[in-house]
């Protein structure tokens, strides 16, 4: 299950069309996937519609087999085959997981002083209807009250609207990884305890490994991930926190990396041949 996925609704960063993500996911034999766009839930309606469209086709096939199962004239062999096929089709029902990669202010959404206050990254997933309502509330507050470069929330809002939510510590831009990279291991552990205290077993440490041999790709991210992952794994063991491995999906197919590279040039306002411009690892496809 992919739990860290960006669509084109991650504006000028993600490149994946929502139906293409679902198509690739199901064709690859994966029947659950989250959508976690940067700071917004703009794609959730399209995500739910695409999932329902796919599931509708599967359910139609199940109904056809149920007709055979209930056919008084069908022999036992056909009914047995139909029962097996129904069980098989049920495993192909897609579970869309509604989420968001939020920006979480390090102190408060009221504090707006410099780059640091733009916010850490944080993966938030709704595990039930109440979680969906709380996720919508957080997203709305982030835009209405917390906007500073990015739509932001903070710890107090997470505590207030925590019910029904699952939290993952996110990429290198997350609170724990940022503190680890700054040498503040104690601070990272304190943050971990805060999340565990609020979310309990619904808080997960997230690790990523974007090793790359692609030309013109970021070669440093993997090294930083390896260093951070060692500390995260140690903290997970020390605090009995569950770990999830994710890929920071920004495009659907491997060959889309070059087009995505150009998109990043647009979003950062840099020329393609600028040696100092931002690069991704080109590993950010739906694997």
Enumerate the language-model features and the residues they cover:
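Phosphodiester-processing cores and adjacent nucleic acid-binding clamps
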Residues: 1-287
